[in-house]
């Protein structure tokens, strides 16, 4: 957690403006403080301000009689210090205060409460559950109830739903337990507080403070707190986001890589909305309001994307404004793999607690943890969603059998979400070789190094489709003549069933590749050695494979039969796909340039 809720007790009492409050402690207990006023923010730096900058008073309490007053009045809270000492069970008397019309889940009668709201003069109150305490303005709440009486009628359900949300989507999800002896695993002992205020620091409408969440006192935010339908339909967006900021791991321990990091923030809100859809029939809120579309609209599109047979590249295929929704769909699918019901995520969060840091520059940490948890290889799932995987991750996962369910067909909002999930056949799956130790050289027809600055051939082996190799070119005759060659040393003799290629969709896309290997696989010290006899394994061209010049993600090409090879040579003899270059224009020889982003080999398992 970023911030544990401060140990503040609600008293259900309110101090009148300027009126003397007497607090008597009939015990030798030390380490308590009384606070009058729930609006703890100091707005001195704001000018002009909408309320006085400091509106609370506080005072340490000692055994015996204590007095305090606040010229503006306010709720009465008691805060416990870390070094409090004395009896755990003692009597505290508070005199001179008014009873606040708080709603306390499990003990407040709705009818009597509404009547109290109408007759009391106390301006602020709390809505209290076991794990939440909301400080709200009586007048604004009463106006909302007058407009919609179900707000009051459903208040017990609303606070119970909030308690369940905090316990399930935050405590349990982050592997926290109420009363745990291990403090690293212990859920907060005090409720999550939300205080509505007329003005916030830094001109914000909501922020996380050391005593809870502070939000603007508006109908919109009060509705997020007090409306059962708003909560259960997943429309309490601001409050859920604030809670996520408090419970989520700091960036240094986050397991979430860039492709899904925005979606993760919405997991608690989505789970609440899905529950509301199932239990109450409420249409789900947009979850990502900034996208301008709903989950109900975008999820089917996301599932259709993942279910296609063509290769995918998530960050390139999906528009940035809807990526969070698409990514969320994939995370929900994983949560329900084999009816796991989010248990993997809970275990993941438990493991991270023991880590000093987590590398989330790629998906590798998350992917390995997922494979270890289910003892299955989830490469097909990542490929269907177009998520990048490193060779290291693929090699690690290959020790497990492939996942056996096509979970990318799971439809979260369907009446029977798993109805379309079928068995996933493992035969014919392309297992990719780990290229970590490979060496690669790019050469022109004259045997010279052949790559443009910053686009060396080793980028073909880095598992990153945003980088790649481009042969050298210039706007003059120094652009080298064809053919070009890529020479690869795999460092050991390897069973190979074919090759894959990615990112061959630029103006410089290759139109013909001839894959060759030496007749003799003895160690080669010089790939330019004229005594090496090369034999052709397969020829890949845009005539037999019309898709070749348009491959953005991976294209896979089988060898006629399995080969045992250590060395490969890729010969590029033809001009690129762009027919705008004119060879008679001697200042432009870019028709020769070749470029793609990934190259590797694959094999089949028996």
Regions found by a protein language model. Name each.
Residues 1-101:
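Beta-strand-enriched, solvent-exposed domains that form extended recognition/catalytic surfaces
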Residues 16-22, 481-483, 491-498, 510, ...:
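Extended extracellular/luminal ectodomain segments enriched in beta-structured repeat modules
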Residues 28-32, 84, 479, 503-511:
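Extended, low-complexity, turn-rich repeat/linker tracts enriched in Gly/Pro/Ser/Thr and Asp/Glu
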Residues 82-130, 577-606:
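Exposed low-complexity, polar/acidic, P/S/T/G-rich flexible segments that act as propeptides
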Residues 113-115, 123-336:
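Catalytic cores of extracellular degradative/oxidative enzymes
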Residues 134, 296-394:
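Active-site-proximal alpha-helical
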Residues 423-492, 504-509, 602-605:
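Disordered, acidic Ser/Thr/Pro-rich linker "stalks" and the adjacent N-terminal cap
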Residues 481-483, 506-606:
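Trp- and acidic/polar-enriched beta-sheet ligand-binding modules for extracellular glycan
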